[in-house]
């Protein structure tokens, strides 16, 4: 494969349909949470802190055409959540994946940054009152995706992104183990050459621990 000459790139346009779908999904999650808010809340004691912070490790797994541009990579993601209600949380995330541009000669190192905000709908806690519990959840959100070469003098590109997620949190006393998978749809523009903007897909899988106050 021949070396591509670096040229400045501009922000890729993102198909508005994907972003609209994420907003609609988040709205539906909030509406669903409102209908279950009157249910018995013993699975979610009011003494629980509304704020939750976890740093997770995982992997960014390109799918489809994205596999021709990115190498699967280790990923670190920081998440801050606020429990608006026992069944609904607002979650902000910042992720960093250490990938490579496999479309170029020598596959230069490429930092992939993902940042977003979304809504998370949580089901009743299974085995409530027991030492070991499990809480499944599903969510959706939108934000941005940036690509930046670590050692090449090339401008970073920035794109809109949307995701759907599913996962669960396993609890033992004050320890929580969170496992989550996210399916991302993002805008994409070739980083080192002129070309048409497109839409790409990848999956993030992450796991992390946190300690609760009670």
What positions do the PLM features span?
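Cleavable N-terminal export/targeting peptides
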Residues: 1-48, 214
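Short glycine/proline- and aromatic-enriched beta-strand/turn motifs that initiate or cap beta-hairpins
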Residues: 34-82, 90, 142, 206-214
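Gram-negative (and chloroplast) outer-membrane scaffold detector with strong preference
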Residues: 39-41, 79-152, 159, 210-214
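Transmembrane beta-strands of outer-membrane beta-barrel proteins
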Residues: 49-55, 86, 90-92, 115-117, ...
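A mature extracytoplasmic/lumenal domain signature
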Residues: 57, 94-96, 183
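Outer-membrane beta-barrel proteins
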Residues: 64-67, 101-105, 147-151, 177, ...
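Predominantly the C-terminal beta-signal and adjacent terminal strand-loop region
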Residues: 99, 109-112, 171-214
């Amino acid at each position: 494969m021949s070396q591509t000459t670096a040229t400045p790139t501009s922000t890729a346009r993102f198909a508005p349909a994907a972003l609209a779908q994420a907003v609609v999904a988040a709205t539906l999650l909030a509406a669903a949470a409102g209908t279950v808010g009157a249910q018995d809340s013993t699975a979610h004691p009011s003494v629980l802190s509304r704020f939750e912070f976890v740093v997770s490790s995982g992997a960014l797994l390109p799918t489809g055409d994205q596999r021709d541009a990115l190498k699967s990579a280790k990923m670190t993601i920081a998440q801050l959540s606020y429990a608006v209600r026992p069944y609904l949380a607002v979650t902000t995330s910042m992720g960093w994946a250490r990938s490579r541009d496999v479309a170029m000669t020598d596959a230069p190192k490429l930092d992939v940054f993902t940042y977003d905000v979304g809504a998370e709908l949580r089901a009743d806690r299974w085995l409530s009152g027991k030492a070991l519990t499990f809480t499944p959840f599903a969510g959706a959100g939108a934000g941005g995706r940036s690509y930046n070469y670590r050692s090449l003098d090339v401008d970073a590109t920035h794109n809109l992104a949307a995701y759907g997620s599913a996962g669960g949190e396993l609890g033992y006393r004050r320890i929580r183990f969170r496992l989550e998978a996210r399916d991302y749809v993002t805008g994409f523009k070739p980083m080192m050459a002129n070309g048409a903007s497109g839409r790409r897909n990848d999956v993030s899988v992450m796991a992390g621990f946190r300690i609760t106050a009670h």
